């Protein structure tokens, strides 16, 4: 909890850095990330989205009648003060999906904007889902990791 509070305070104060939250189903990962967003959103912009929904939004731009480009969607998510990507690892893990995530996270990395990744996967398995370049960027400059190692609260 202290790591999450410090992370939120850092974002509010204009700091960078990233956070990876991992744990089994029902351990409160999304709730914790939502609390971080609630703390941040009073002073900064924050966007929370499941990775699969982000991928869908980008793919929707491929339709003939789309009024928005792939790059515009990527820029929307790359420019908010804090981006929370939930359910990392439930997507198919295709090269295209990994490229989309890399594009968003790399732009955020270049802009020194913080990102939170939430996953049921162990931290060492996240690279398989999103690519090692993404994980490398998230860990740089003191990226934090929270392991929620307790039983589901939904039972």
Question: Predicted regions: what is each one?
Answer:
Residues 1-19:
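Pre-Walker A (pre-P-loop) alpha-helix and adjacent loop at the N terminus of AAA/AAA+ ATPase modules
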Residues 2, 41-79:
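Short glycine-rich substrate-engagement loop in P-loop NTPases that contacts/grips substrate
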Residues 15-33:
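Walker A/P-loop nucleotide-binding motif
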Residues 16-20, 45-46, 82, 114-116:
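Residue-level preference for the first positions of well-ordered beta-strands
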Residues 31-43:
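P-loop NTPase Walker A phosphate-binding motif
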């Amino acid at each position: 909890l202290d790591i999450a509070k410090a992370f939120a305070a850092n974002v509010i104060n204009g700091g960078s850095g990233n956070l990876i939250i991992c744990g089994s189903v029902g351990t409160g990962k999304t709730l914790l990330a939502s609390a971080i967003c609630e703390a941040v959103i009073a002073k900064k912009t924050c966007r929370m989205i499941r990775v699969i929904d982000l991928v869908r939004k980008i793919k929707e731009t491929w339709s003939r009648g789309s009024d928005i480009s792939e790059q515009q969607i990527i820029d929307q998510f790359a420019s908010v003060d804090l981006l929370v990507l939930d359910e990392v690892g439930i997507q198919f893990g295709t090269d295209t999906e990994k490229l989309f995530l890399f594009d968003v996270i790399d732009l955020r990395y270049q802009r020194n904007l913080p990102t939170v990744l939430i996953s049921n996967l162990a931290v060492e398995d996240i690279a398989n889902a999103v690519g090692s370049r993404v994980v490398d960027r998230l860990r740089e400059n003191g990226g934090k990791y929270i392991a929620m190692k307790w039983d589901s609260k939904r039972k």
